[in-house]
UniProtKB/Swiss-Prot annotation:
InterPro entries, alphabetized: Aldolase_TIM, NanE, RibuloseP-bd_barrel
The keyword Cell membrane belongs to this UniProt entry's keyword annotation: no
Natural source organism: Streptococcus pyogenes serotype M2 (strain MGAS10270)
SUPFAM superfamilies, per database record: Ribulose-phoshate binding barrel
Similarity comment text for this entry: Belongs to the NanE family.
Main EC class the enzyme belongs to: isomerase
Pathway assigned to this chain's UniProt record: Amino-sugar metabolism; N-acetylneuraminate degradation; D-fructose 6-phosphate from N-acetylneuraminate: step 3/5
GO biological process, one term: N-acetylmannosamine catabolic process
Disulfide bonds: none
Superkingdom of source: Bacteria
Name of the protein in its database record: Putative N-acetylmannosamine-6-phosphate 2-epimerase
Function comment: Converts N-acetylmannosamine-6-phosphate (ManNAc-6-P) to N-acetylglucosamine-6-phosphate (GlcNAc-6-P).
UniProt keywords, alphabetically: Carbohydrate metabolism, Isomerase
Length: 234
């Protein structure tokens, strides 16, 4: 297992490349109770030249670590109803991810009510206090959320949840305006969410982001097939 990179070293590694998100949830075609599928996705991503992997769950991350030394952005998706945040939503999930020695832990940093009752700045501070050497990424949906996370000391701000909170932009395609505004504010941005084409990725890269995560457009064959099929119907 490689040593955990510093922020500077990781930014160097991610610059101008694609981080591939390799995830499948229960009910999706590529989900398997016994695992084994996501490391194959990660292997394909590595062979293609990906600079990092984003992965969900302790099991998938461990399996991916066994086949690649690429830096991993790790999350744990777990529902805490009635609250909406489910991406690394409490310290329990942070603890589980921190034990895996991954490059980055990503967590929900939206302004929505949280299961632990904390505001996001307090949660970030608690995580930083407990794991001072762990790089952290805030999954946000608006500029203000990104700013709050940045001011609380987060290392990277991801546009992951734009369009997935009721108060954020709801259009198709990546939130270019949000990505650009965060970059202009001097924040290390990892662009993520609704990036469907190499052309979009190129435009985003030109905005000066720290990294780009592409998931569904690469690793969800059902979603890819649906886009082709819909195109023929329209």
């Amino acid at each position: 297992m490689p040593d955990k990179p510093t922020k500077e070293k990781l930014m160097e590694q991610l610059k101008g490349g694609i981080i591939v998100s390799c995830q499948a949830l229960p009910g999706e075609p590529l989900y398997s109770e016994t695992g084994g599928i996501m490391p194959l996705m990660a292997k394909a991503a590595q062979e293609a030249g990906a600079v990092g992997i984003r992965a969900n769950s302790v099991r998938d991350i461990k399996e991916i670590q066994a086949i690649t030394d690429l830096p991993i952005i790790g999350i744990i998706k777990k529902d805490y109803p009635p609250q909406e945040p489910f991406i690394t939503a409490t310290m329990i999930e942070v603890d589980q991810l921190a034990a895996l020695n991954i490059a980055v832990i990503a967590m929900d940093c939206t302004k929505r009510d949280r299961y632990d009752g904390l505001d996001i700045a307090s949660f970030i501070r608690q995580v930083k206090e407990k794991y001072p050497n762990q790089l952290l990424m805030a999954d946000i949906s608006t500029f203000d959320e990104g700013l709050v996370a940045h001011q609380a000391g987060i290392d990277f701000v991801g546009t992951t949840l734009s369009g997935y909170t009721p108060y954020s932009r709801q259009e198709a395609g990546p939130d270019m305006a949000l990505i650009e505004a965060l970059c202009k504010a001097g924040i290390a941005v990892i662009a993520e969410g609704k990036i469907h084409s190499p052309e979009e990725a190129k435009k985003i890269n030109d905005l000066g982001v720290a990294g780009i995560v592409v998931g569904g457009a690469i690793t969800r064959p059902k979603e890819i097939a649906e886009r082709f099929i819909e195109a023929l119907k329209s």
